UniProtKB/Swiss-Prot annotation:
Belongs to the ubiquitin-conjugating enzyme family. It is a peripheral membrane protein. The lineage of its organism: Eukaryota, Viridiplantae, Streptophyta, Embryophyta, Tracheophyta. GO terms for cellular component: peroxisomal membrane. This is Protein PEROXIN-4. It comes from the Eukaryota. It comes from Arabidopsis thaliana. Its EC number is 2.3.2.23. PANTHER family: UBIQUITIN-CONJUGATING ENZYME E2 (PTHR24067). Required for peroxisome biogenesis. Necessary for the developmental elimination of obsolete peroxisome matrix proteins. May be involved in the ubiquitination of PEX5, targeting it for recycling. Accepts the ubiquitin from the E1 complex and catalyzes its covalent attachment to other proteins. One of its GO terms (biological process) is protein import into peroxisome matrix.
């Protein structure tokens, strides 16, 4: 457990240095538990998520970095690789393709890349996956933009 705490503390210091370098990601460590983190990520440009800010919850296991963190969306998102109700993310690096070389920051970058390039053939949200697999990109974009407006954009007024 000491090794994982040391690694997370190192990542925490790195995140403090990276704040200006990577304005699309804001990682925040829980004040009382270094194994709990949240992230705010900006929706990638030229996607239906553009303009949205999405909150992620990280639960880091004690054997980290030998085991991947559990990550889920707290913000509702219409995406084939994200379970609509639980926010669970289907991403290989969070499962069998994990490597200790990954950091919480690089996991956020991978999630942003997944947002820009969905994998409709391994869906956790079948409705959005079916829209993309059937070629209805317009329908998918419309739904994704609607949920981005409703859940990931600041309310006006």
């Amino acid at each position: 457990m000491q090794a994982s705490r040391a690694r997370l503390f190192k990542e925490y210091k790195e995140v403090q240095r990276e704040k200006v370098a990577d304005p699309d990601i804001q990682l925040i460590c829980d004040d009382t538990n270094i194994f709990k983190w949240t992230a705010l990520i900006k929706g990638p440009s030229e996607t239906p998520y553009e303009g949205g800010v999405f909150q992620l919850a990280f639960s880091v296991p004690e054997p980290y970095p030998l085991q991947p963190p559990q990550v889920r969306f707290l913000t509702k998102i219409f995406h084939p690789n994200v379970h609509f109700k639980t926010g669970e993310i289907c991403l290989d690096i969070l499962k069998n393709a994990w490597s200790p070389a990954w950091t919480l920051q690089s996991v956020c970058r991978a999630i942003i890349a997944l947002m820009a390039h969905p994998e409709p053939d391994s869906p956790l949200n079948c409705d959005s996956g079916n829209l993309l697999r059937s070629g209805d990109v317009r329908g998918f974009n419309s739904m994704a933009q609607m949920y981005t407006r409703l859940a990931a954009m600041p309310k006006k007024g």
